[in-house]
Amino acid sequence: MHGSLQGNAALLDRLMAGAATLSCEVAVCAPYPYLAQVQSTLAGTPILWGAQSVSEHASGAFTGEVSASMLRDFGCHYVLVGHSERRQLFGESDAAVAAKFVAAQQAGL
């Protein structure tokens, strides 16, 4: 859990300053509260953006979770699945990671 509007703006400015020299795809995966900032700041640049996690559930009573279709509806391109911190700190199993991967793929992420 890192970031702030001001800190994100500074980081994104530095990334955009080097965007013209990129020889690979670059994506920024931000915490949910900052997705709108990242989306608007990176619009029109070659830098893509995504979220840091996704629910394996398509819908339902999963308070605080964000589905893959919600992310895609918002214009998200990428999502991190199976990150070591989520696996270690939240106990995400291979089965949970696989379910999240399937959900992300089905939504076009």
Region locations from a protein language model:
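Conserved N-terminal beta1-alpha1 strand-loop-helix module at the mouth
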Residues: 1-66
